[in-house]
Regions:
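Hydrophobic helix-and-loop "lid/oligomerization" segment in the mid-to-C-terminal part
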Residues: 1-27, 40-43, 48-49, 128, ...
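Generic hydrophobic/packing signal
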Residues: 27-30, 56-59, 110
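Short, hinge-like loop/turn segments at secondary-structure boundaries
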Residues: 28-33, 72, 95-98, 250
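Conserved phosphate-coordination/catalytic loops
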Residues: 36, 100, 213-214
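Short alpha-helices
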Residues: 80-150
C-alpha cells in the first residue's frame, strides 16, 4: 500500500474481517476497509478496480464472504503468496513457498523492479512486521541468511525493530495474560509418549476472559518450550463462526502441514500450519489423538 501510494496510484486495502488489536498501530491501519463491516462500499471498490492484488492467500475460500466479490470483479488479478498449492484464480501468480513470508516476497518484488529507494520508513515498518509475525519472531522458517540481509536493508530506512517488537508482543491486555495462565494450568495436555501437546479453548472460556481477536496469538507455540515436545496443536472454538480453528506448530522435520491437510481440512508450511474443523470440541480432540497414533513413528524419530 505504501509503495503503490508512493507511485501515485489510488490504492485501497480491504480485509475480510477484523484484524488483531496488536497491529492497529501500523502506519495506514486506520485506512483499512473491513469487508464484513463495509460490504457495499468494498464491493463497489472491487468491481471498479483495475487491478486486485491478492496478498498472503492462495485460495478464494481463505477470504470468506469476500470471495465472490473478488472472483466476479472484472479487474486483473495478481497473487503474491508463499503458501503451498495455489489455486489458479489470478492472471498473474507469484508463489514462492520457500520464502518465509509474503512480506519478504513483496520486498523482493519491489527491489527486483528497481524501486528499493522508493520504500519509505512506514512501508519498511510494515514489511518488517509481516516478516517478524509470520516467522514467530524469526523462530521458524527463518534460517535463510538473506532474511537478515533484508532486515539490514529495512533498518537502513530508519525503522526501530525493537520498538516494533514491543508494539506487537508487549501491548496485550490484562485479560490475555490471565487467559494464558488459565490455558497453561487447565487447558494444556502433554502427551510425552508422542512428544506432543494439545491446547484447547471453548467460546465460553474465551468470553470469561473478555477475549478479543489476537488474544490467543502465539499460544500454540508455548508447549514447544517443553523439553522433547516437537508438535503442538491449538483448538479454539471460533467466536464468529460455528467451527473450530486449528493451529499446528512443530520443530525440526515433523510435517505439521501433512497433519493439517489429512485431519483438519488445512495446510501450510512444514513447521507452521492451520486448519478448520466442523464438529464438537470432543470430536476435534479425538481426531488429534488419532493423528498422534498415525504419525507416531515420525514423532518419535531421532534427529
Amino acid at each position: 500500500w505504501h509503495f503503490l501510494e508512493s507511485q501515485e496510484k489510488t490504492v485501497n486495502v480491504i480485509v475480510p474481517n477484523a484484524f488483531p488489536d496488536f497491529l492497529r498501530w501500523m502506519p495506514g491501519a486506520k485506512d483499512i476497509i473491513r469487508y464484513d463491516k463495509y460490504t457495499e462500499f468494498a464491493n463497489k471498490l472491487l468491481n471498479e478496480a483495475d487491478v486486485i492484488c491478492c496478498l498472503d492467500f492462495n485460495a478464494l475460500s481463505r477470504i470468506d464472504a469476500m470471495a465472490d466479490a473478488v472472483a466476479q470483479s472484472p479487474a486483473r488479478k495478481m497473487m503474491i503468496d508463499h503458501h503451498l498449492n495455489p489455486e489458479a484464480f489470478c492472471r498473474i501468480i507469484i508463489s514462492h513457498p520457500e520464502i518465509s513470508s509474503t512480506s519478504e516476497l513483496v520486498f523482493r518484488l519491489i527491489c527486483r523492479l528497481g524501486y528499493f529507494e522508493d520504500i519509505t520508513k512506514e512501508g519498511a515498518e510494515c514489511i518488517y512486521t509481516g516478516m517478524m509475525t509470520d516467522t514467530g519472531g524469526f523462530t521458524y522458517n527463518s534460517n535463510d541468511r538473506e532474511i537478515y540481509f533484508i532486515i539490514s536493508e529495512l533498518l537502513s530506512k530508519g525503522i526501530d525493530k525493537d520498538e516494533i517488537y514491543r508494539k506487537v508482543y508487549n501491548t496485550y491486555s490484562e485479560g490475555r495474560l490471565r487467559l494464558m495462565g488459565y490455558v497453561l494450568y487447565d487447558k494444556m495436555q502433554v502427551f510425552p509418549q508422542f512428544n506432543s501437546a494439545l491446547v484447547w479453548l471453548t467460546k465460553e472460556e474465551q468470553s470469561k476472559f473478555q477475549y478479543v481477536k489476537g488474544d490467543t496469538e502465539g499460544f500454540v507455540n508455548i508447549p514447544l518450550s517443553i523439553k522433547n515436545i516437537i508438535f503442538s496443536v491449538f483448538l479454539r472454538e471460533d467466536t464468529e463462526k460455528n467451527m473450530i480453528k486449528v493451529s499446528l506448530r512443530s520443530v525440526g522435520a515433523f510435517p505439521c502441514n501433512k497433519v493439517a491437510a489429512e485431519f483438519f481440512n488445512g495446510g501450510g508450511h512444514l513447521n507452521a500450519s492451520g486448519g478448520e474443523f466442523y464438529g464438537t470440541m470432543d470430536e476435534a480432540i479425538d481426531l488429534f489423538k488419532q493423528a498422534l497414533v498415525k504419525y507416531e513413528e515420525l514423532l518419535l524419530a531421532k534427529k
